[in-house]
Amino acid sequence: MKLLLFTALVLVVISLIEVEAENERACIPLEKECTKTPGNCCSGLRCDCYRRFEQGVAKGIQCWCIEKDVTYKGV
């Protein structure tokens, strides 16, 4: 019985620590890079990714936090 209560207490403490760490995580603001953390843009923003080319050769993917429902077109 004591082992069961101790296990439950440990699980509760671990889950509280995880929730607190997630709440303290700073969001990524508008027009900042989100390549490594695509789900971490601030509220009202989305992470949009583009494949970068140099002289026709793919050089990787770049992602940026941009406003939702906004579409950018090349000029």
From Swiss-Prot:
Expression sites by tissue: Expressed by the venom gland.
GO molecular function, one term: toxin activity
UniProt family annotation: Belongs to the neurotoxin 19 (CSTX) family. 06 (U6-Lctx) subfamily.
Post-translational modification: Contains 4 disulfide bonds.
The keyword Cell division belongs to this UniProt entry's keyword annotation: no
Entry's localization field: Secreted
InterPro entries assigned to the protein according to its UniProt record, in alphabetical order: Spider_toxin_CSTX_knottin
Propeptide: 22-25
A Pfam family recorded for this sequence: Toxin_35
GO annotations of cellular component type: extracellular region
Organism: Lycosa singoriensis
Keyword check for Signal: yes
Keywords: Disulfide bond, Secreted, Signal, Toxin
Name this polypeptide is given: U6-lycotoxin-Ls1e
Residues in the signal sequence: 1-21
